[in-house]
């Protein structure tokens, strides 16, 4: 961590406070009151955050990582699985009180419940699963499982995610059997949301751990999605190997010492995918999670990068440098000016950056050219300064009133 700090890099730690591991956890044997048996979880009885000693245990653990090891922040795993929501507010208050300014501590959530109130109560940001799911559908066409909630009107869905953060802000979810999900989030800053195209869950939980380099409909569409992700005001997150277009799968792997537990996990994976015909219908050749070979096969550097890897590195490098110089210095105080869909697969969005500059996005994630509506005048595009285009013809075609297929355009207008 000290070495990273010397290089100007921050380091965050992913902490799991919603459960202990299923293997090697002996705490129930000598501290049974630590758990509550009225709430079962896939990992056993739930942790009892009603107990003051339990709450203090995890507060001290967070402080330990931040003070003894000097991590710059924590990413809290799956906090929707913690039934005592008030403890999360208590944790943020405790950490902020123990580590006051000027030291900056980042507290980031993974929360399937989309609780905006936590981002109003001491947490900095949340991983934006909604935006990922919309973009994944647009890139791959997949519409089963939880992607079913995002397959209808993907252009509208992406527009809402870019303008307001989450798609689900209290409306019912079909995938969750009609139960409401989420809280209103339009009042939050764009930097309250972490935007990603891939992560360890979204790849590793797939049957074969396949990446977007294998799944995306076209290479051009994936390049456009990367340009959207890295230049949007939301915080970009990249998964290892994305930057060089890795095609090595990231498989689901474990290291359980208990043979019975390893067998149960192996069988559970097969049953999980039995109802997904596109994933093999329970194919018995699913990689064994507890095999060391499965772990070894997930090394993102396993396959030689070649020329294609170099092209991806150059693509990411160009976009990250552009973000560093043109976007990041202006993010404080940025607010959305709204977004709208362009056809089924396109979107137009605008943000007023902190220094008054206007950032504009035109994206077409579809296979056909998308005519611009009369309300978006090509002459205004022509007058604006182009920040980036994902294809050589994208900007010129937009000036003529059409968005090229699988393309994206960013405009940046300075305002004094």
Show which residues each predicted segment covers.
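Substrate-binding/active-site clefts of carbohydrate-active enzymes
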Residues: 1-109, 116-118
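Carbohydrate-interacting/catalytic domains
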Residues: 210, 214-223, 228-238, 242-416
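Generic recognition of stable, solvent-exposed alpha-helical segments in well-folded globular domains
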Residues: 8-11, 53, 57-60, 83-90, ...
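Extended hydrophobic-aromatic, low-complexity segments
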Residues: 27, 56, 205-206, 361, ...
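Conserved alpha/beta catalytic core and glycan-binding cleft of carbohydrate-active enzymes
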Residues: 92-280
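Generic, well-ordered alpha-helical scaffold segments in large soluble proteins
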Residues: 3-7, 61-64, 68, 91-94, ...
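Short glycine/proline-rich turn/loop motifs
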Residues: 39-49, 199-213, 292-304
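Short, glycine/charged-enriched secondary-structure capping and boundary segments
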Residues: 25-28, 88-91, 121-123, 253-255, ...
């Amino acid at each position: 961590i000290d070495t990273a700090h010397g290089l100007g890099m921050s380091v965050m730690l992913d902490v799991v406070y919603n459960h202990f591991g299923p293997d090697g956890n002996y705490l129930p044997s000598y501290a049974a009151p630590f758990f509550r048996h009225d709430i079962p979880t896939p990992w056993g009885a739930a942790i009892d955050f009603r107990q003051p000693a339990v709450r203090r245990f995890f507060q001290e653990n967070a402080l330990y990582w931040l003070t003894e090891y000097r991590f710059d922040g924590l990413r809290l795993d799956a906090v929707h699985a913690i039934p005592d929501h008030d403890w999360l507010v208590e944790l943020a208050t405790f950490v902020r009180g123990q580590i006051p300014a000027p030291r900056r501590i980042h507290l980031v959530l993974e929360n399937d419940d989309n609780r905006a109130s936590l981002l109003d109560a001491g947490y900095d940001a949340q991983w934006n699963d909604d935006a990922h799911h919309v973009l994944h559908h647009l890139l791959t066409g997949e519409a089963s499982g939880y992607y079913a909630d995002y397959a209808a009107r993907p252009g509208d869905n992406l527009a809402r995610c870019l303008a307001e953060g989450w798609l689900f802000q209290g409306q019912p979810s079909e995938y969750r059997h009609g139960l409401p999900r989420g809280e209103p989030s339009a009042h939050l800053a764009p930097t309250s949301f972490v935007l990603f195209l891939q992560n360890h869950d979204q790849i590793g939980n797939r049957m074969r751990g396949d990446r977007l380099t294998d799944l995306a409909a076209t290479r051009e569409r994936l390049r456009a999605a990367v340009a959207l992700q890295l230049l949007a005001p939301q915080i970009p997150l990249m998964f290892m190997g994305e930057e060089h277009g890795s095609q090595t799968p990231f498989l689901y792997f474990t290291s359980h010492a208990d043979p019975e537990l390893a067998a149960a996990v192996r069988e559970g994976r097969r049953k999980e995918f039995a109802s997904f015909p596109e994933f093999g219908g329970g194919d018995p050749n699913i990689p064994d999670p507890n095999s060391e070979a499965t772990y070894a096969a997930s090394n993102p550097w396993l396959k030689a990068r070649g020329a294609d890897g170099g092209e991806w590195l150059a693509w990411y490098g160009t976009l990250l440098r552009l973000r560093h110089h043109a976007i990041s210095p202006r993010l404080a105080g940025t607010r959305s000016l709204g977004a709208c869909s362009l056809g089924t697969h396109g979107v137009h969005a605008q943000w007023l950056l902190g220094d008054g500059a206007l950032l504009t996005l035109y994206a077409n994630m579809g296979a056909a050219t998308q005519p611009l509506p009369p309300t978006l005048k090509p002459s205004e595009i022509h007058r604006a300064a182009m920040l980036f285009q994902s294809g050589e013809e994208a900007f010129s075609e937009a000036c003529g009133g059409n968005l090229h297929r699988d393309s994206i355009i960013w405009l940046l207008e300075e305002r004094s």
